[in-house]
Design a protein with these regions (language model features):
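Feature captures the catalytic cores and cofactor-binding loops of soluble hydro-lyases/lyases
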Residues: 32-167
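Short, charged beta-turn/beta-strand-edge "cap" motif at the junction between a beta-strand
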Residues: 23, 29-33, 175
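Short, surface-exposed secondary-structure edge patches
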Residues: 12-17
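Short, structured beta-strand/loop micro-motifs enriched in basic residues and often containing a Trp
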Residues: 1-10
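C-terminal binding/interaction regions
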Residues: 140-204
């Protein structure tokens, strides 16, 4: 298990160094994205002025407060609570995020499916997991909301955060076919089969 300090944008070679159970801490730029954002971009053809190539995105729709624009709050938004949402709803967007936008890292909770794992392997990407219920802690890692695009979708806008020490995050899916979710599922199925056999129950 290795630890990595990364400052996006990162290269394919860097993301392929990551292995399941490694930890990653991010510095610099992090983009916030959610269901409506990706529907707008990939289903409805809306463009963004942000270059996501080599970057990390986090599945979030942050709670923010409108304030006067200043050096501290350049967009006129102050972060209140920036937490992570469940990723599984956005499974179908993993491949286009990597293939069309050049995203390298996806941060979320709960994991993604086999289609995403295949995309990570083919295109060079990884999924970094956050434990649910840590939004207050995550918010302390965000120094500022630097910019926002597609803001008519608020709060599911496309956010550009400046982060410091964002992590450690666990590499839960890597570009080599590794997935803690697949491993847990296989282990649970094995234990279920053993328990049923011990009870004399035939598994269906």
């Amino acid at each position: 298990m290795a630890t990595h300090q990364l400052t996006p944008p990162i290269t394919e070679a860097q993301v392929r160094e990551l292995r399941v159970d490694d930890t990653v801490t991010l510095q610099g730029t992090l983009f916030g994205i959610r269901d409506a954002t990706q529907i707008a971009i990939f289903d409805r053809g809306r463009a963004t002025r942000f270059d996501l190539a080599g970057h990390a995105v986090i599945h979030t729709a942050p709670n923010v407060r409108k304030v006067a624009a200043s050096a501290e709050f350049p967009t006129g938004y102050a972060p209140v609570c920036i937490g992570t949402t469940t990723s599984s709803r956005m499974e179908r967007f993993t491949r286009p995020l990597l293939a069309q936008c050049g995203v390298r890292l996806i941060i979320g909770k709960g994991g993604l499916g086999p289609g995403s794992l295949a995309a990570f392997s083919e295109l060079g990407g990884a999924y970094l997991a956050i434990i649910g219920g840590t939004a207050a802690l995550e918010t302390t890692w965000v120094e500022a909301i630097e910019d926002v695009d597609l803001d008519d979708l608020h709060p599911e806008s496309l956010w550009r955060f400046r982060v410091c020490g964002f992590g450690p995050l666990r590499v839960a899916m890597d570009s080599h076919g590794g997935s803690i979710y697949a491993a847990v599922d296989a282990g649970a199925r094995g234990k279920r089969a053993a328990a049923l056999a011990a009870l004399g129950v035939k598994a269906g």
